[in-house]
């Protein structure tokens, strides 16, 4: 599928998410955060993300995971390559190291000992769209795609897409390098994808 078709799809899916309204996203978000708690284990390293715009917020999950002793990590984008490292989720009051303004992605970056994605047990992946085969449509930055593709043969982390029901479609366009995720959690429940 050509880029302009992907752009149109992103626009459509973002519109659907926006049309849920603030209260709708809030209620669905609480349900999703509750469902995500099944992945919490003491000492388990879990990659989360910093939500942008109307992306699903993980606040409830983060609080529960911290309380129960899981180790949370946020993406740290290398300025020159498109690959991500992961740094420990900041304790309250920790100042962000820098803002990343390139490519319209204003993601706070935090200092700390960096690990690669294969050091995580679980990685929650933000989505613009998700299909029933486990393929995702992202923000178009390519950061998750590049990171997962580079770790393809070493990837121990379970990759879970998180988002709203309205972002789930039957099929999405895919590129040869795209890797399917292991699952998707929305307000309707948990989908597990079998890839064989």
Regions found by a protein language model. Give the residues of each.
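N-terminal active-site beta-alpha-beta segment that forms phosphate/nucleotide-binding
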Residues: 1-119
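Conserved phosphate- and dinucleotide-binding cores of soluble alpha/beta proteins
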Residues: 82-196
């Amino acid at each position: 599928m050509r880029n302009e078709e992907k752009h149109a799809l992103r626009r459509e899916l973002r519109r659907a998410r926006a049309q849920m309204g603030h209260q709708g996203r809030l209620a669905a978000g609480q349900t999703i955060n509750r469902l995500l708690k099944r992945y919490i284990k003491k000492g388990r390293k879990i990659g989360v993300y910093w939500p942008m715009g109307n992306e699903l917020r993980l606040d409830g999950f983060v609080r529960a995971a911290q309380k129960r002793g899981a180790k949370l990590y946020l993406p740290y984008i290398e300025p020159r390559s498109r690959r991500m490292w992961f740094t420990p989720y900041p304790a309250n009051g920790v100042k962000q190291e820098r803002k990343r303004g390139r490519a319209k992605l204003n993601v706070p970056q935090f200092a700390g000992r960096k690990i690669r994605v294969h050091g995580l047990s679980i990685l929650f992946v933000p989505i613009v769209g998700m299909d029933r085969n486990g393929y995702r449509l992202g923000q178009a930055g390519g950061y998750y795609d590049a990171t997962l593709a580079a770790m393809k043969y070493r990837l121990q982390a379970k990759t879970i897409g998180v988002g709203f029901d309205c972002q789930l479609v039957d099929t999405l366009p895919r590129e040869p390098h795209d890797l399917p995720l292991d699952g998707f959690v929305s307000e309707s429940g948990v989908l597990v994808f079998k890839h064989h």
